[in-house]
Structures are given as structure tokens and as C-alpha cells.
């Protein structure tokens, strides 16, 4: 069954004190949020244990921003699914464009991370999307279909979320038109073995466009960057109309 999931990706922002202040401002604004909407906060690693204790028993689920494919080992700077599960994480972002661009993430390593997340009962949020050059060259579909074909080898689509993030719209203020995002997400859904996979849109989602985005038939939620750092703007996204 397709779920509605609004997930905030904090990237490399917020100390524990800032996270605490954020939650104090957010929680009171979620009292009327429909129960069927799932809210996820993907925080920096340093905040996971702290946030897990505060969020216990609330409607907000905890997410991480990366996971290694091994359970342990000499992998400096990495974190395992076993470790994430141990601190109460439920979701983990895999294959975000910034990981692919800045840290050499490939479809092969994305695939291994997806399977590692599922091995430990974590729900991965797989990010796929095209660059501005690929879109202008008419390669949007072929690029995304290639990502899906390689990333999802032997991945259980029953425990999976996909986020369509047009790279040219991330942090730029340029938003993919809602109908175009809906079209691409429909194409993504058509390539999956399971039509009930939750598919989010990510890319400059803001209070002034979230209602239009979430009104689209194929869009099940949002993966939010900058607007998730402010409790007022994030609560507006969660409580979209």
C-alpha cells in the first residue's frame, strides 16, 4: 500500500542543541496532522541517538543519510545498518545526488547499500534523478531507467521508498513543475515490479508549492532539504492541504 511520507533531510546542519530547539518548535504544530501521514527526519549521525530518545513514542520516525554495506570493518567515516538500527533508525537515504556527485557513489555501491539497509530492517529511500544537461538533451527517462535497473538488482521492493530528485532543482530554487514531476514519477512507477512503492518528489519543495505537488496523483510524498530546517516551514509541508 502506498504511504504518504514527508521526509526532512537535514544534510550537514544542526547541532544537538539546534535539533532540540527545532523539535520544540515543531511538535506543537503537528497535533492535527493526519495519522496516515508519516513524518521522517533524516539527521546527521551525531544527532541520531539523541533524537531517538526524544522522538520515542511520537509520530516522527528517525532517518539517517547513509549506510555502509558491511556490518563492521575498517571503513573509516562510514556507519553500518547494524549501528543505525541500534540507535532507533527506521529510514535511511541511499544514493542522494550529493553522495553520487561529491563522494563517488556509483550504482553498484548504491545497490549494496540498499540491500544492507533492508537486511537490518531499515527502509531505504532511494534517490534517482537527472542533471540539467541530461534533461536538456532529452535523456531524463533513459538516465533514470538506467539508475533503477542497476540500483534495484535483488532489492526487495516491498520495503522501499523512491525519491525522484531532479538534480537541477536541488537547492537552486528551481522547482520541477508539479505536472512534470508527476509524469516522471508515473514513468518510474511503471518500471517497478511493485506498483505500490511510495515515490516522493524532492527538489526545492517549499510551503508555496507543496499543495500543488501533493495534489498530483502519482506523488506520494516529499523529500525536503532546506525547508526542513525550519519548524514553521516544515510543519507547513507536513500539514499540506
Swiss-Prot record:
EC class (word): isomerase
Gene Ontology molecular function terms on file: triose-phosphate isomerase activity
GO cellular component: cytosol
Pathway(s) where this gene product acts: Carbohydrate biosynthesis; gluconeogenesis; Carbohydrate degradation; glycolysis; D-glyceraldehyde 3-phosphate from glycerone phosphate: step 1/1
The entry's keywords: Cytoplasm, Gluconeogenesis, Glycolysis, Isomerase
Keyword Disulfide bond tagged: no
BP term (GO), one: glyceraldehyde-3-phosphate biosynthetic process
Matches recorded under PROSITE patterns: TIM_1, TIM_2
Record-listed substrate binding positions: 9-11, 171, 204, 225-226
Major subcellular site: cytoplasm
InterPro entries for the chain: Aldolase_TIM, TIM_sf, TrioseP_Isoase_bac/euk, Triosephosphate_isomerase, Triosephosphate_isomerase_AS
Cellular compartments annotated: Cytoplasm
EC number(s) stated in the UniProt entry for this protein: 5.3.1.1
Family assignment from sequence similarity: Belongs to the triosephosphate isomerase family.
Function (record text): Involved in the gluconeogenesis. Catalyzes stereospecifically the conversion of dihydroxyacetone phosphate (DHAP) to D-glyceraldehyde-3-phosphate (G3P).
Subunit structure comment from the entry: Homodimer.
Name this polypeptide is given: Triosephosphate isomerase
Protein species of origin: Trichodesmium erythraeum (strain IMS101)
Amino acid at each position: 500500500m502506498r504511504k504518504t511520507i514527508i521526509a526532512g533531510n537535514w544534510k550537514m546542519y544542526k547541532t544537538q542543541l539546534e535539533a532540540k530547539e527545532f523539535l520544540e518548535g515543531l511538535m506543537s504544530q503537528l497535533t492535527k496532522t493526519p495519522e496516515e501521514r508519516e513524518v521522517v527526519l533524516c539527521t546527521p549521525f551525531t544527532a541520531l541517538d539523541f533524537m531517538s530518545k526524544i522522538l520515542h513514542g511520537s509520530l516522527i520516525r528517525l532517518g539517517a543519510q547513509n549506510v555502509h554495506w558491511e556490518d563492521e570493518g575498517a571503513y573509516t567515516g562510514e556507519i553500518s545498518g547494524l549501528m543505525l538500527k541500534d540507535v532507533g533508525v527506521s529510514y535511511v537515504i541511499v544514493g542522494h545526488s550529493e553522495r553520487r556527485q561529491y563522494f563517488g557513489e556509483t550504482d553498484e555501491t548504491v545497490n549494496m547499500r540498499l540491500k544492507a539497509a533492508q537486511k537490518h530492517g531499515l527502509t531505504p529511500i532511494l534517490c534517482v534523478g537527472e542533471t540539467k544537461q541530461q534533461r536538456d538533451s532529452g535523456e531524463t527517462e533513459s538516465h533514470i531507467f538506467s539508475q533503477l535497473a542497476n540500483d534495484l538488482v535483488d532489492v526487495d521492493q516491498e520495503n522501499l521508498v523512491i525519491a525522484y530528485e531532479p538534480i537541477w532543482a536541488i537547492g537552486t530554487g528551481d522547482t520541477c513543475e508539479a505536472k512534470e514531476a508527476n509524469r516522471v514519477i508515473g514513468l518510474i512507477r511503471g518500471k517497478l515490479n511493485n506498483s505500490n512503492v511510495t515515490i516522493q518528489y524532492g527538489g526545492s519543495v517549499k510551503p508555496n508549492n507543496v499543495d500543488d505537488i501533493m495534489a498530483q496523483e502519482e506523488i506520494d510524498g516529499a523529500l525536503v532539504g532546506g525547508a526542513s530546517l525550519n519548524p514553521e516551514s516544515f510543519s507547513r509541508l507536513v500539514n499540506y492541504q
